[in-house]
Amino acid sequence: MRLDVRYFERRQIKEAIAFAEGGGIAIHRNFDHYHGSTIRGMRRERPFLHVIGLRENLEAWGRLHGLRPEWIQPEKRRKVAHYDVFGPYAEELIAKWSPS
């Protein structure tokens, strides 16, 4: 399975969700509100991203990139789910996928 992956800036959330609902994987730059907080014993550092997609596609992309399916945040008002990604791994994704 080849997945189309695209990076979206903060203000492009509508475009990111539409892209993900269409079957792509959207790497969306999120706000850094949680910088310094902890979750499950991990300290969250900026930058923060959401990796958004239809669950099946997101699981496939996650497996290719070392992310576990149980880390996926559930679908809520939309049909897409997402991973929360932060810190050095988020920096790697930005470096790889950001057009700038």
Regions found by a protein language model. Name each.
Residues 1-39, 44:
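Charged, low-complexity intrinsically disordered tails and linkers
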Residues 6-12, 55, 68, 86:
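Alpha-helix initiation/capping motif
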Residues 31, 55, 89:
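A broadly conserved detector of short glycine/acidic/proline-rich loop/turn motifs that flank catalytic sites
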Residues 39, 58-60:
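Intein-associated homing endonuclease modules of the LAGLIDADG/DOD-type, together
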Residues 42-46, 75-78:
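Short glycine-enriched loop/turn motifs at secondary-structure junctions
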Residues 50-56:
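Short, surface-exposed ligand-recognition loops at beta-strand->loop->(often short) alpha-helix junctions
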Residues 60-100:
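Short, compact, well-ordered microdomains
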